[in-house]
Amino acid sequence: GNTASGLETLWQICASLQRLGYPVVVLDGTAQESDDSPGLLHLLQHATWNDGASLNLGATASSLAVIPAAKGLQHLSRKASGSTRSPMESLLPCFRTYGLMVIHAPASTLGPLLTHTATVPLVVMGSGAAGVMTSYKSLKQIALHTGLPCMVAALLHSNTAAERRKAQSQLMTLQACAERHLGGPIRTTTIATQNPQDLQRLALQLLENAGTMNGALAALTPSNLTGMPAHFVRSH
């Protein structure tokens, strides 16, 4: 389904970024931390842990480090209200050894985390009317907290002319809704999931838009992952 293919695309993008020489750590906001599976919350509670050394991230130079982060991200999201600084800055000491951080989390959690940033979040749209609606909800959540302009990408699985036309039509519908109800324009693009060049182009766009943890941030919001955005940020 859309969720599986969207997740696969997310991992492919992360793999492209690693091939470009950026060690990637993924904070999975859909996975709960526990004593058996420690994650972000444990890092935030134990500041003496050095660069995440006490976490078994299971990563090598060629694999992704993925850690549970649902509770930790919710904690940071709550702390964001009323702050004049990006809540992402507090993560820097934990992940200095990584070149790039990916945050995969619900839009309601991610929105507050993007406050005080200068970025262009990228929303990956699923197919059909449901994909348009889910993408719009993600855009609305981000706009509610940040007012940031977004780019929306439609995934093309077979990359036929008919599929491309349908995707373009859905993007135009979403664009019109965003301009009418959210008060701002969005940029759009299409990504053929079976085309390595398209995936690398998207990875490079994310890298280009990503700033530092105390500067500009970039986000990928795959709304077809049942509304689970993923946020990309350089750690240094």
Name each model-derived stretch.
Residues E8-R19, T134-L144:
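Histidine-anchored nucleotide/phosphate-binding helix
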Residues M88-Y98, P106-A129:
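Inter-motif core of Ras-like GTPase G domains
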